[in-house]
Amino acid sequence: DCMPDTLLDYLEELNRQTFLLVEYGRESTDDATLARINRGHTFACTEDAVRRTAGRGILTGGHVILGLPGEDSEKLIQQAETLSQLPLTTLKMHQLQLIKGTRMAHEFAFHLYAVDEYIDLVIDYIEHLRADLVLEWFVSQSPKELLIAPDWGLKNHEFTARLKRRMEERDAWQGKQLK
């Protein structure tokens, strides 16, 4: 997530000619988590890149994984509030997925969310996000032959329909709990 000024200069010029959105895959706001998953940067580095990109008038997006080891719901709520303070236009989020052949797959001594548990986590999370932040997606799907877990057997649109129903049941909306 290093963004040199020369590249920002180019993107700023390109942004004048066409639609452009730069997405940063930050995955987490917790530096200990970022080190554990070998991201090679701190949150401060990503925050700087986001602010400099948005400061050039470029639409800026983010991407996070919910359910990384060591990140409980309390940490994730704090993460949502932290992200709400950044000049992000869009946010993509998805569940942690264990993929065959990865280091994390060999460890697998941590909690993975069941679908209904994850739906409630997503609702808690988005209640702490700015209302104007465009949420692009809530889940990701890996190829079945590579996926160890979780296998919820849902397409993205099916998950989103369940999420919407649960939000209505809970009288929840984006930004409801943001301080």
Regions from the PLM with identified roles:
Residues 7, 34-36, 72-74, 146-148:
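A short acidic (Asp/Glu
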Residues 34, 38, 69, 106-111:
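Short helix/strand-bridging catalytic loops that position acidic/His residues to coordinate divalent metals
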Residues 1-5, 69, 140-145:
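Short, internal active-site loops enriched in acidic
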Residues 90, 98-179:
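Auxiliary Fe-S-binding modules of radical SAM enzymes
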Residues 44-103, 116-141:
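Conserved C-terminal portion of the radical SAM core fold
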Residues 1-50, 54-55:
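Conserved SAM/AdoMet-binding glycine-rich loop
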Residues 13-17, 42-45, 81, 110-112, ...:
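Short, low-complexity, polar/charged sequence segments that are solvent-exposed and flexible
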Residues 28, 32-34, 61-64, 105:
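N-terminal small/glycine-rich loop or linker at the start of catalytic domains
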